[in-house]
Swiss-Prot record:
UniProt biased composition (Polar residues): 30-47, 54-68, 90-114, 124-139, 568-579
Chain ranges of zinc fingers (C2H2-type): 146-171, 182-206, 212-234
The protein, known as: pH-response transcription factor pacC/RIM101
GO cellular component, one term: nucleus
Family: Belongs to the pacC/RIM101 family.
Organism field: Yarrowia lipolytica (strain CLIB 122 / E 150)
Free-text description of this protein's post-translational modifications in UniProt: Activated by C-terminal proteolytic cleavage by signaling protease (probably palB/RIM13) at neutral to alkaline ambient pH.
Residues passing through the membrane, by range: none
Assembly and interaction partners: Binds to DNA. Interacts with RIM20, which binds to the two YPX[LI] motifs and is required for proteolytic processing.
GO MF assignments: DNA binding; zinc ion binding
Segments of this protein annotated with the region Disordered: 1-68, 84-142, 353-391, 555-585
Keyword set, alphabetical order: Activator, Cytoplasm, DNA-binding, Metal-binding, Nucleus, Repeat, Repressor, Transcription, Transcription regulation, Zinc, Zinc-finger
Compositionally biased tracts (Low complexity): 9-29, 355-387
GO biological process, one term: positive regulation of transcription by RNA polymerase II
Amino acid sequence: MASYPYLAQSQPPQQQQQQQQQPQQQSQQLPTTAPSAAPQVNNTTANKPLYPASPNSPISPSDYSANMNVGGDSVDMLLSSVSAHHRSSDAGQSDMGSISPSTAHTTPDATTYKTSDEEDATGKITTPRSEGSPNTNGSGSDGENLVCKWGPCGKTFGSAEKLYAHLCDAHVGRKCTHNLSLVCNWDNCGIVTVKRDHITSHIRVHVPLKPYKCDFCTKSFKRPQDLKKHVKTHADDNEQAHNAYAKPHMQHTHQQQQQQQRYMQYPTYASGYEYPYYRYSQPQVQVPMVPSYAAVGHMPTPPMHPHAPIDRKRQWDTTSDFFDDIKRARVTPNYSSDIASRLSTIEQYIGIQGQQQQASPTPQTATTTSATPAPAAPHQATPPQQQLPSFKQGDYQETDQFLNQLGSNIYGNIKSVDPQYEAPAEFHLPHPMGYRYAFSHAPAPHGAAPVAPQVAPPAHPGVHGVSAPHYPDLSYSRSTVPQLSSRFEDVRQMSVGVTQRAARTTNVEESDDDDELVEGFGKMAIADSKAMQVAQMKKHLEVVSYLRRVLQEARETESGEAEDTAANKDTSASKSSLYPTIKAC
C-alpha cells in the first residue's frame, strides 16, 4: 500500500466535517454480505480525521496502525479523502493571496522571489534590484548613482568626485560663509572634529574616492596619510633587502672590531700605559686626517666642502665651556680621552684658520672679554664675535697654569712616542710666572720659590725627564716614587676579591701561542698608529698654545683698560675738587 505525505497547511473546519461525513456515507452504501466478509472498522478511528490538523501536531502510533489496518474496500475511501484534501489545499492557497506572475511584472517595485535555480551560494534568496532603482549603498563602480546619506539629503550623483564636492560645499561648509559644520552626519556617524581639514579628510572614508595613488605599485588610497603609511612599507622592504645584501660585509666588520677589542685590552707599551689619543669618541665632529696617512685605512678621509664643515657658534661655545670647566676645577691637566675629545672639537674651530689667527689675533675688551678671530680664508665663513666667560685676575693665572701643565703633558707624550720631536718655534710661549700682573693684590709669600707644574711621568721606559728648549725643565726623580719590584716584573697582576675562590690548578702546561699572538697584534698597532698619534698630539699642542695666547691677550687688554679707567678717575677727581691737591713725587 502506497503512503502519502502529510500536507503542511491546516484545513478549514468545514472541509474537515465533509471529510468525516464522506466515509460514513460510503460505509452505509456498501452491500451487506456474510458477517465474516464485512470489514471491521473501529468507531473511535472513524470519527477522527485521517491527517493531523497542522504539521506540528504528531500522530500517535495507535492511530497510524488503525488507519493502516483497513480492508481492501476502504482503499477507495482513503483515495477519495486524499484527493479532496488536495483540492481544498489548492483552494486555500489561492485564498491566501499569492501574487501571479502577471501581477509581478506589472508592478516594478513589487518584491519577487527567486526559484531554487536563482539562489545564491549561501542558500539565501536575495531580492534583485530593478534597473531603474538607484544604488543606496553610497558606493559603487563608475556609471552607478551614489546617494548622499548626510542626514535627510538623499541626492544622487553620478561620480564619487561630485559627491565629495557636494559634501564639502553643501554640508561641511566654510567659516567665511558662516555655515561650517564639524560633525559628520553621514549615516549617523557622529564623528566630531576641530578643523575643517579634519572633517573633509574624514569624509573620504565614506566616499568611494581614491585619488592618491602609489608610485611603486597599483594601489590607491582615500587619504594622503594612508598613502604615506603605505609608502613606508616599500621603504621597509627596501631596507630589509639592503640589510640582507650588506650582511656579509657587516659580519666581516664585526669580526674586525672583535679582533681589535681583543688585543686592545692588553698593554701596548712596555711601561703598561696605554695612550687614549686615537681611541676617544668625538660626538660633534670628526678630526680631519693628514693626507699622507689616509692610506692606512683606520680613518676615512673627510669630504672636502666649499663651506665650513660645522657650526662655528657651537664650537666656540665648546671653547667657552672648556674655560668654564677649568675655572671650576672640573678637569685635570692630564692628557686623557676627555681632554683629547675637547681639544679636537676646539681644533675644528681654529685648525683651518690657525695661521691667520696666530699671526694677528684680535684683542679683547675688558667688559665683555670677547675674542674676535681674524678674517677667514676666502672659502670660509667668518665666525661671529663670541664672548669668553668672565675672568677674575686670579682666574687668568690659574687657567694659564692649567694650560701650561696640559701642554707639558702633551709634549711629554709626544716625546715618548717620537724622541726626535722638537716643538716648533712659533708655538713657544714664555713661562706663565713671567707674565705681568698689574692688579695682583695678593703678593706671593716671602721666600716662596716658583713651583714648576707637575707633569705625569713619560710612558717610555728609557726617558726619565722631559726638557724642551722653551718649556721649563721638568725632572722626574726616582727617589720621590717608591720603587716596587712588581713594577718591573713581567707578570700580570690581577685583583681577587675576598669572597672569590682561586681556580684549581691543572697539570696541562699553558701554551705561549696566545702571548705571541698578543705581542704580534701590539706591534701591528704601534706600527700603524704611531704616525697618527704624533700628528694628533701635535694638533692638540697647537690648540693649547693658541688658547694660552688668547688668554694672555685678554688679560693684557683688560689690564691696560683698567689703568686707563683709573687715570680717568684721578683726572675727574682733580677737576671736581674745590681745593688744590699736591701729589707726592
